[in-house]
Amino acid sequence: MRKLGRYLLEGRLGAGSFATVWKAYDPELDTDVAVKVLADNWASNADVRERFLAEARLLRRISSPRVVRVHDVGVQDDRPYFVMDYVPGGTLAEKIGHCRPAEALHLAAEAGYAVQVLHDTGVVHRDIKPSNLLLDAGRTPTAVLVADLGSAKQLADASGLTVTTGTPAYMAPEQAFQTGGFDGRADVYALGVVTFELLTGRKPFGSGGRATLTTEQASTSSPPAIPSDLGVPNGIDRLLRAALSVDPGDRPQTAQAFADALLSQGGGEWAPARSSRPTRLVVWLAAIVVYLVTAVLTWLVR
């Protein structure tokens, strides 16, 4: 088993262009942790290295149960790493196509409240997507934590790096096309994409998002409607169309407002209306009951 500092690496949780995250065991504290390690090909880049460590400091500064917390930093073989909470429930990506509307809307609202914590501390995430939203199955109901601040606007501004960061399918038009400054409403857009994907199992604009369209196409495109057979209230469809608006001014203005609207528009009635026709199982059970009653009555008459 590979060792990093005092931490025993047990398996890879995820990897990106700049870093890899491992599940690890801390023998001194007898607990599981997650360790993020800067990629070897970036370790000698001073700007990237500082941005990596700045992410650790930023996560440490944000004290909230909705954001993963950093507990330690270190360097091994000239590669910096930092140690975070290990959240055992996986990520929202594993829920795509596998949750009912009620659960989807609960998880999306939880994600919105987690993103609001970042915004309250002046942080715009810029890469909200299912794999960066962790599920804490140890809480009831399941809570969502936000992770990976490596693309946060504050870190990019401080480092001087000008490369557009984010995942195209979840990027707001103003972020994808760099049409000027952007704020937390870009994260609200991403939350809209995540919610649509949780409900339908697919992204509203395909894997490339609006970033693959021309500027003109992006400005006139609108998301497809949510299929009616999902039983999702009409208010949710309208809310998602607003969240995915090209104009940030037409979106919910905060992540919390988006989350609140998800819960209030849903009204708690998520299941599609059931058919009034009896199912085959019910018919068979009724037939069995009639048969048994008839048999008993016949025996008593004898």
Language-model segments: what does each one mean?
Residues 107-108:
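Activation segment signature within eukaryotic-like protein kinase domains
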